[in-house]
Amino acid sequence: MNVFLSKYINGVDKKSRVTVPANYRAVLGKELFNGVIAYPSIRNNCIEVCGIAHIEKLRKMIETLDPYSEERDAFETMIFGEAVQLAFDGEGRIILPQSLMKHADIEEQACFVGKGIIFEIWQPQNFEKYLSYAQNIAHEKRLTLRNVH
């Protein structure tokens, strides 16, 4: 399967290492880089994580914007300028940079949330609050989903 699914909570050690769930690593197994690319979410108080293929898609989307627009500059700065490549160690762990941990309020635990083509890393209590909000939105907007044939 080539999508990130499910939710996992893993501990973060004193060296800021956290284990990426095995099934997430399996999705990334086809990537050229043995690790992930992480950047601060521009939507939520979390870290967005993906492989190189998704970063390429983001690059192509951003390149459609006027090269001198504020929007393009902001997206390039927040996504590419703040992105870091995080290699897996022998145990499937990554080291979370302090800047990303601060952005997401992560300390001792990290909540991994599958979002299809990306996954997010949250502070667990913050994710639970967001989950309630997301459930309400999904319930209200459920009829907007369409079948794709």
UniProtKB/Swiss-Prot annotation:
Keywords: Cytoplasm, DNA-binding, Repeat, Transcription, Transcription regulation. It is found in: Cytoplasm, Nucleoid. GO terms for biological process: negative regulation of DNA-templated transcription initiation. Residues 7-54, 83-126 form the SpoVT-AbrB domain. Pfam families: MraZ. The keyword Transcription regulation applies. Its main location: cytoplasm. Disulfide bonds: none annotated. PROSITE patterns: SPOVT_ABRB. GO terms for molecular function: DNA-binding transcription factor activity; transcription cis-regulatory region binding. One of its GO terms (cellular component) is cytoplasm. Forms oligomers. Belongs to the MraZ family. This is Transcriptional regulator MraZ.
